[in-house]
Swiss-Prot record:
Pfam families for this protein: Ribosomal_L20
Gene3D superfamilies: 6.10.160.10, Ribosomal protein L20
Name listed for the protein in its UniProt record: Large ribosomal subunit protein bL20
Organism: Rippkaea orientalis (strain PCC 8801 / RF-1) (Cyanothece sp. (strain PCC 8801))
GO molecular function: rRNA binding; structural constituent of ribosome
Transmembrane segments: none
GO biological process: ribosomal large subunit assembly; translation
InterPro entries according to UniProt: Ribosomal_bL20, RIBOSOMAL_L20_CS, Ribosomal_protein_bL20_C
GO cellular component, one term: ribonucleoprotein complex
UniProt entry keywords in alphabetical sequence: Ribonucleoprotein, Ribosomal protein, RNA-binding, rRNA-binding
Amino acid sequence: MTRVKRGNVARKRRKKVLKLAKGFRGSHSKLFRTANQQVMKALRNAYRDRRKRKRDFRRLWITRINAAARVHGISYSKLTGQLKKANIELNRKMLAQLAILDPQAFAKVVETANAAQ
């Protein structure tokens, strides 16, 4: 069996991890073992939070639409039901943007939805 020297492979692997750990504080960016643990934790959190971000924004949009709808005397759930009946296909993001940036247009949407009832 011939001898296999793996120094270059190990160095490359460690350098890759330390490069990912750049910006971490203290030994978390200097020592391989702690840096490796922190990089794995950071990647795990990033993966989880990319999915969580979608849920968080949906909750935010619903809260904003509900607040704006209640100003016009209607709840969020009633508004969404009436929008479906009126065949108005605005998604939650669009409705939330309208509620904040153009309240008159949002009022028109609510009025149209109420008329279709």
